[in-house]
Amino acid sequence: MEVKIFNTQDVQDFLRVASGLEQEGGNPRVKQIIHRVLSDLYKAIEDLNITSDEYWAGVAYLNQLGANQEAGLLSPGLGFDHYLDMRMDAEDAALGIENATPRTIEGPLYVAGAPESVGYARMDDGSDPNGHTLILHGTIFDADGKPLPNAKVEIWHANTKGFYSHFDPTGEQQAFNMRRSIITDENGQYRVRTILPAGYGCPPEGPTQQLLNQLGRHGNRPAHIHYFVSADGHRKLTTQINVAGDPYTYDDFAYATREGLVVDAVEHTDPEAIKANDVEGPFAEMVFDLKLTRLVDGVDNQVVDRPRLAV
Ligand code: DHB
Ligand code: FE
């Protein structure tokens, strides 16, 4: 039988009580958000006639998600991260700010505290038996389009199994493997030697993949490399590049692929190029320049503060 009680005074009063709106104390913003989200969920239960069994399956699911530390993985899978980017893009458009280098999601796997160097860094420790050398370099430009020395370029990516150091279930990787901060040189350039990453897949037995299965969706990301770029007088840029040609480039479960962020990995076998780049054999090269945007009235109006692992 279908009953409709959501719009009764009883239920509406109850929502205010449960959200603390009839109480002194607490945090008004939290009350406002909880009241709205709770109301939307109560209404969904009524509209969709969600059963008690379905509801309790959801509660058990949330417990599992937390126990597996996967809330930050499900979030991009359900598009929240990309939606927040779309909102920031729209805010920028309304302010007339052009992002020559598009932003895209941070993902849940950044770790603060990576080794820092000027101009160049070797990112991998040479231990990945399937590693194919990658030389990745480019120039950071300021808001006027001039090369920007002394910008901080933080780069992180996965190994050839798609695992990130500090989050690697095999325990094979050393701390900060394939995580570096490079300060741009006097020409605004950064350069790293590393290995080509592989695409990433959600833990196959985890709760994120379990829900994606119910949606008929896969949990794969294309091979990608993350960036934070920050510099005085500029807004911090959070983005990623995708290695062109990956089967998931335009089918990313986390919806991070954007026009302008797909970069060719050009293969070099020529002995001259091998020598000039100081590598041992054939290697791939990717070139990616990034352009920053100015602070807005002296502040970074879009900097994201979120809990991050720091080592
Ligand atoms: C996820 C993993 C990533 O490497 C990433 O960049 C974004 C999201 C994830 O597991 O959700
Ligand atoms: Fe990632």
UniProtKB/Swiss-Prot annotation:
Record text on cofactor binding: Binds 1 Fe(3+) ion per subunit.
Annotated metabolic or biological route of this protein: Aromatic compound metabolism; beta-ketoadipate pathway; 5-oxo-4,5-dihydro-2-furylacetate from catechol: step 1/3
Sequence positions that bind Fe cation: 164, 200, 224, 226
Any GO molecular function: ferric iron binding
PROSITE patterns, A to Z: INTRADIOL_DIOXYGENAS
Domain notes: Contains a helical zipper domain, consisting of five N-terminal helices from each subunit, which forms the molecular dimer axis.
Sites where the protein binds catechol: 164, 224-226
Protein name: Catechol 1,2-dioxygenase
Named cofactor requirement(s): Fe(3+)
Listed CDD domains: 1_2-CTD
Assembly notes: Homodimer.
Pfam families registered for this protein in UniProt: Dioxygenase_C, Dioxygenase_N
EC number per UniProt: 1.13.11.1
Gene this protein is translated from: catA
Biological process terms in GO annotation: beta-ketoadipate pathway; catechol-containing compound catabolic process
Reaction(s) the record says it catalyses: catechol + O2 = cis,cis-muconate + 2 H(+)
Keywords annotated in UniProt: Aromatic hydrocarbons catabolism, Dioxygenase, Iron, Metal-binding, Oxidoreductase
InterPro entries noted in UniProt: Catechol_dOase_N (IPR007535), Cchol_dOase_prob (IPR012801), Intradiol_dOase_C (IPR000627), Intradiol_dOase_core (IPR015889), Intradiol_RC_Dioxygenase (IPR050770)
